[in-house]
């Protein structure tokens, strides 16, 4: 299997994709569909999906010199898909709501924080 290394460039929520850039020059770009997780090569000027990346390609997502995800269109041992920020944010919010079922609004959250030890110092 071939391995490529990419870094996260930006999230394009309007077109439901995350845009990545290769670690090494010459730079090339790839997109990951945030709905179904499919990877595509991308045009360099406006980041349009070009071709679907082959299933035998492993994509290493690099951040601060570390591999944070192993992803790709195929199935392989050790696959650890990239989690888009909006998904992470939604999962975090849902986990908080599950833990604190009485919190339904910003005002509820503010009241909850005020009753924590030294909660007044937060505001």
Language model: regions and residue ranges:
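Short intrinsically disordered terminal tails
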Residues: 1-2, 114-123
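Structural detector for short beta-strands of small beta-barrel domains
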Residues: 3-12
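Acidic, low-complexity, intrinsically disordered interaction modules
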Residues: 13-104
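Residue-level detector of alpha-helical secondary structure
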Residues: 93-97, 110, 114-117
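Short, surface-exposed acidic
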Residues: 105-109
């Amino acid at each position: 299997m071939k391995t490529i290394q990419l870094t996260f460039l930006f999230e394009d929520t309007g077109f439901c994709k995350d845009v990545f850039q290769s670690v090494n020059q010459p730079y090339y770009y790839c997109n990951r569909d945030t709905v179904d997780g499919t990877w595509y090569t991308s045009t360099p000027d406006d980041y349009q999906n070009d071709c679907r990346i082959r299933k035998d390609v492993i994509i290493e997502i690099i951040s601060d010199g570390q591999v944070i995800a192993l992803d790709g269109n195929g199935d392989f041992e050790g696959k650890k898909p990239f989690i888009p920020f909006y998904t992470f944010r939604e999962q975090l919010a849902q986990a908080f709501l599950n833990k604190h079922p009485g919190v339904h609004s910003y005002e509820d959250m503010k009241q909850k924080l005020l009753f924590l030890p030294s909660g007044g110092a937060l505001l």
